[in-house]
Regions:
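AlphaC helix of the eukaryotic protein kinase fold
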Residues: 44-62
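Conserved short submotifs of the Hanks-type protein kinase catalytic core
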Residues: 80-96
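Catalytic-loop of the protein kinase fold
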Residues: 127-146
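Activation segment signature within eukaryotic-like protein kinase domains
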Residues: 115-116
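AlphaC helix of the protein kinase catalytic domain
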Residues: 97-107
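Conserved activation segment of eukaryotic-like protein kinases, specifically the C-terminal portion
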Residues: 171-182
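ATP-binding glycine-rich loop module of kinase domains
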Residues: 27-50
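Conserved HxN/HPN-centered segment at the entrance to the catalytic loop
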Residues: 64-74
């Protein structure tokens, strides 16, 4: 059994231009999110030239913070003759901030205070790394809310536009970014 075969797809959550995100379970019935990335569709700026690894997966391997979605597994697989990378994250019982705002018609000041505080803590953590990480592209579609407790806990996700500040090539992958959310 290959590493990716331990995960069984429950359903597709969303499709991107070069990736699909699935809800999966493992052999022990653990629930996870699996991001399957088509390597042929990536831009060269999404790879670390020194390691030939996808920057997003490489960065998430190095970080751990309560307001950042945790990557628990990653690797590569050949599926139907195509090369893919995958990143597995903990399943979060909740929804995207954008979905939450749409469903509720807004967000209370009380909830927003906790969301913003959590995001600022995550950004402070990223910026304080030995090689500071610039997230780029913070938007309501890249913030997952854990709704398992009374107060929503925000988690930054989708590091596809993130980069290390000390990286020799300071260009970043801009496709799909909104100028309103660049940071």
């Amino acid at each position: 059994i290959t590493a990716i075969e331990q995960y069984k797809v429950v359903f597709l959550l969303r499709k991107g231009s070069y990736y699909d995100v699935y809800r999966v379970v493992d052999n022990k019935d653990g629930k996870y999110f699996l991001k399957l990335i088509n390597l042929a569709k990536l831009d060269e700026l999404q790879f670390n030239p020194a390691t030939d690894q996808i920057c997003e997966i490489e960065m998430k391997r190095e970080i751990s913070h309560p307001n950042i979605m945790r990557q628990i597994d990653s690797g590569e697989a050949i599926i139907d003759g195509q090369r893919y990378a995958y990143s597995v994250s903990d399943f979060i019982p909740g929804e995207l901030l954008s979905e939450n705002i749409s469903r509720k018609g807004g967000c209370s000041i009380y909830d927003m205070k906790h969301i913003v505080t959590g995001l600022l803590n995550a950004l402070k953590y990223l910026h304080s790394q030995k090689e500071p990480i610039i997230f780029n592209g913070i938007s309501p579609n890249r913030i997952m809310l854990n709704l398992s407790s009374g107060t929503p806990i925000p988690l930054l996700m989708d590091f596809d536009h993130a980069r290390k500040l000390n990286k020799v090539n300071l260009k970043c992958y801009m496709k799909g970014l909104s100028p309103f959310y660049l940071a």
